[in-house]
Amino acid sequence: LSFTLNDGDFVTVIGGNGAGKSTMLNLIAGVYTADAGSIVLDGADITKLPEYKRAKLLGRVFQDPMMGTAGNMGIEENLAMAYRRGRTRTLRWGISNEEREFYKEKLQRLDLGLEGRLTSKVRLLSGGQRQALTLLMATLQNPRLLLLDEHTAALDPKTAHKVLTLTEKITSENRLSTLM
């Protein structure tokens, strides 16, 4: 398989169950090791790069709304983890007022009322709210490539439509290259 994605491209891969769509995304993310060939991102061969190092370059939203977030942590804590991904860690964990305002502004754009619930545990959110939060977390740092693994499959049709609309809005505003 060989393909090229340009900046801002949104490509949807279509195939039946077991066709290898999720496997392809897992290969790109570094979950699986490629037997042959190479994976090149922005001209750099990332084939041998470990998954945790690829995480700096990639955003990812899974099919299961429970994945991608820490359910026992608050909304702002989840956002802080995503925002700080790939950065040097310090002993300080607190969230500054500036960061909190940044998160509120980002959450407001989702139009789900989450900006007033920053300390709410993520496990208390609906599947659609959680998936929208995961999408926001995956795109906070403007990744080089956004991987969406059937991210609306577990949602009801109305909620799936809302999440897809948010996906289109976020990816087009940030010119994110996206593989779904």
Question: What are the residue ranges of the model-derived segments?
Answer:
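The feature captures the beta-strand-to-loop junction immediately N-terminal to the Walker
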Residues: I14-G16
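Helix-to-loop junction immediately C-terminal to a conserved catalytic motif
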Residues: A29
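Conserved ABC transporter NBD signature motif
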Residues: G37-D45
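ABC ATPase NBD coupling module
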Residues: D45-G59, M67, G71, R89-S96
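Q-loop/switch helix immediately C-terminal to the Walker
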Residues: N72-T88
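ABC ATPase C-loop
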Residues: A138-T139
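Catalytic Walker B motif of ABC-type/P-loop ATPase nucleotide-binding domains
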Residues: L146-E150
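Helix N-cap at the start of a conserved alpha-helix in ABC-type nucleotide-binding domains
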Residues: P157-T159
